[in-house]
Amino acid sequence: MLFGKRKRIVKRILIVEDEPLTAFDNETMLADLGYEVVATLDSFDDAITLLGREDIDLVLSDMRLSGERSGLDLARAAKERGIPVLFSTGYDVPEEGKAVAVGCLSKPYSERQLKNALEAVDRLLAGEQVKPAKGLELYITPDA
C-alpha cells in the first residue's frame, strides 16, 4: 500500500469573476495553493472561447458576470463539455444551477476556506464521500 498525498484531479482552474478585486484575490490565493490559473476572465463569451481551446479541470465562477450572460449560462456550457463548475457567490444559487455545478462556495471566503472547498471538490470528482467544508454547499454525490 502506498502512503502519501493523493494526486490532484483539479490542477488547472479558470476564474470567471466580474469584480476585479475578487478576481485578483482568487488568482493570488489559487497560485499560493499550488493551482495553475489558466486565465482570469469576466464574461461568458471570453470564458466559452477559452474553454474551447484550453484544458481546464475546473471553472471557479461567480453567478453574476459582465455582459448579458450569467455564471449559470457558463455552468450549462461547461457541463456540456464535461468541465465541472464551482460557483463562488454571495447570492442564492437557483435550482437549475444546482443541476449543472458541483457546488457553491459562499462569498466572502478566506484562503483556507477556498483550499478546503477545492480539496472537497477534488475528492468528490475522484468518487470519494465528502463532508462539505465551511461555506461550501455540494450539489453532486459520488454516485451522480
Describe the function of each predicted region.
Residues 52-54, 77-83:
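Conserved phosphotransfer cores of two-component systems
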Residues 17:
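Conserved acidic carboxylate
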Residues 1-12, 111-144:
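Non-catalytic signal-transmission and effector/linker regions of two-component phosphorelay proteins
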Residues 107:
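A Lys-centered signature of the CheY-like receiver
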Residues 61-79:
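Conserved phosphotransfer microenvironments
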Residues 27, 40-58, 66:
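Acidic, metal-coordinating helix/loop segments flanking the phosphotransfer/catalytic sites
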Residues 20-39:
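Two-component/phosphorelay signaling modules centered on CheY-like receiver
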